[in-house]
């Protein structure tokens, strides 16, 4: 008798995606992050839903409603900190997932890659709006500074900023609309993630060797469900350790002070996962130039498939490209570090050098090294 999972229309869909899915037999732990991102999204939607039940999206009550959640709501403190640190874990998994895609050439699956870029942008927008909701000092000034960047757009910039604010400054209307979008975007992200999976299953997963694996595939269950379960266990262990021992490690102390439009914090900075882009933004002296550099720092990912010059998909057997890849990873860490430092010497010059190196590595060095490696293949 045929199992129900192969006959029932709904079960068949789940079966083809998670149970009998043909999967390359040699994919490593770097392929775990897709399922971990799904787990992160479920965690964020669940904790966010419970927080939304007690949150008040109004400038006069938002800060006190967060205090109420933390102090008075049953287990409110852990729900709040799981949500805040869950966002950090989300971005760690996201960056590692993108890093794996770059290293093993997964960007050649263009539909999957492009939906992934849209997912990244949607996640960044959601996280930014979520950071505004506690209505602390860094929430208020972060929202003011980042939304004000749109004023760099010629002719319509100022009107656009005031339209987003719902007035002449960041206030209650801004907070209400940010809360609305912060609530709805995760569901749009979930829909996009389904599309991401749909297109991935059209081509099948990539593998570390970067060669076709049609002749050597195994079922996703039980082999990779067990592997993903181990990854999930380690992820939950890390998240719970962070949440229970150092819940404010990745936050900003200024956000425990009520938003005050008359008092500017000494160093306005976004959450740690945006610091690399923030450094690139402030490394350009011109406002419009900085905004364009900021956009390009993310959208450059869409150019990666065009810049791929190598005859091999993966970097597995390309030591020169590997060296450049790790140089880029180190450069991103430097950019993240500089983003958290004050705008003064020597940090400004380090930030500018790191920003130039970021774009040079991706746009010039990587394609050039790939062409050199192609020549070396002929000599071998």
Curated annotation (Swiss-Prot):
Any one Gene Ontology MF annotation carried by this entry is: ubiquinol-cytochrome-c reductase activity
Q: Which UniProt keywords apply?
A: Cardiomyopathy, Cataract, Deafness, Disease variant, Electron transport, Heme, Iron, Leber hereditary optic neuropathy, Membrane, Metal-binding, Mitochondrion, Mitochondrion inner membrane, Primary mitochondrial disease, Respiratory chain, Transmembrane, Transmembrane helix, Transport, Ubiquinone
The entry's a ubiquinone-binding residues are: 201
Impact reported for residue 151 to P: In exercise intolerance
For the keyword Heme, the answer is yes
Lipid bilayer topology:
Multi-pass membrane protein
Instruction: Describe what happens upon changing residue 278 to C.
Output: In multisystem disorder
Which Gene3D superfamilies does the entry link to? Answer: Cytochrome Bc1 Complex, Chain C
Q: Which residues form a coiled coil?
A: none
Q: Which GO terms describe its cellular component?
A: membrane; mitochondrial inner membrane; mitochondrion; respiratory chain complex III
Q: Per the UniProt entry, what are the Gene Ontology biological process annotations, in alphabetical order?
A: animal organ regeneration; cellular respiration; electron transport coupled proton transport; mitochondrial electron transport, ubiquinol to cytochrome c; response to cadmium ion; response to calcium ion; response to cobalamin; response to copper ion
Q: Which compartment or compartments is the protein found in? A: Mitochondrion inner membrane
Q: Provide the residue positions that the database annotates as binding heme b b566.
A: 97, 196
Q: Which cofactor does it need?
A: heme b
Mutagenesis / variant outcome for changing residue 276 to L:
In colorectal cancer
Q: Which CDD domains match?
A: cytochrome_b_C, Cytochrome_b_N
Q: What is its main location?
A: mitochondrion
What does the record give as the function of this protein?
Component of the ubiquinol-cytochrome c reductase complex (complex III or cytochrome b-c1 complex) that is part of the mitochondrial respiratory chain. The b-c1 complex mediates electron transfer from ubiquinol to cytochrome c. Contributes to the generation of a proton gradient across the mitochondrial membrane that is then used for ATP synthesis.
What is the additional note? Heme 1 (or BL or b562) is low-potential and absorbs at about 562 nm, and heme 2 (or BH or b566) is high-potential and absorbs at about 566 nm.
Q: What is the protein's given name?
A: Cytochrome b
Organism (species)? Homo sapiens (Human)
- Which gene is annotated as encoding this protein in its UniProt record? MT-CYB
């Amino acid at each position: 008798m045929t199992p129900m999972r192969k006959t029932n229309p709904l079960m068949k869909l789940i079966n083809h995606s998670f149970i009998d899915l043909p999967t390359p037999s040699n994919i490593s732990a770097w392929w775990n992050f897709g399922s971990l991102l799904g787990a992160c999204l479920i965690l964020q939607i669940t904790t966010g839903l419970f927080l939304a039940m007690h949150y008040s999206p109004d400038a006069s009550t938002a800060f006190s409603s967060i205090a109420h959640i933390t102090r008075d709501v049953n287990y409110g403190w852990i729900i709040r900190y799981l949500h805040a640190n869950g966002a950090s874990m989300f971005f760690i998994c996201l960056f590692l997932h993108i890093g794996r895609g770059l290293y093993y050439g997964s960007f050649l699956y263009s539909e999957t890659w492009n939906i992934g870029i849209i997912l990244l942008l949607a996640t960044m927008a959601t996280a930014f709006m979520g950071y505004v909701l506690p209505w602390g000092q860094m929430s208020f000034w972060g929202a003011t500074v980042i939304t004000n960047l749109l004023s760099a757009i010629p002719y319509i910039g100022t009107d656009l900023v005031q339209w987003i604010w719902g007035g002449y400054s960041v206030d209650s209307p801004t907070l209400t609309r940010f809360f609305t979008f912060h609530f709805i975007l995760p569901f749009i992200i979930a829909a996009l993630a389904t599309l991401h999976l749909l297109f991935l299953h059209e081509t099948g997963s990539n593998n570390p060797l970067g060669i076709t694996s049609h002749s050597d595939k195994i079922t996703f269950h039980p082999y990779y469900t067990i592997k993903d379960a181990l990854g999930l266990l380690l992820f939950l262990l890390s998240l719970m350790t962070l949440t229970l021992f150092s819940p404010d490690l990745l936050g900003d102390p200024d956000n425990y002070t009520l938003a005050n439009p008359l008092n500017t914090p000494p160093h306005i900075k976004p959450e740690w996962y945006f610091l690399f882009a923030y450094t690139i933004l402030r490394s350009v002296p011109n406002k419009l130039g900085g905004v364009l550099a900021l956009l390009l720092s993310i959208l450059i990912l869409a150019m990666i498939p065009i810049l791929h010059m190598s005859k091999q998909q993966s970097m597995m057997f390309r030591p020169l490209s590997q060296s450049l890849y790790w140089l880029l990873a180190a450069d991103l860490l430097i950019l993240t570090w500089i983003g958290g430092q004050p705008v003064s010497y020597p940090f400004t010059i380090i930030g500018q050098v790191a920003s130039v190196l970021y774009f040079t590595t991706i746009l010039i060095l990587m394609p050039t090294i790939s062409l050199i490696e192609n020549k070396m293949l002929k000599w071998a």
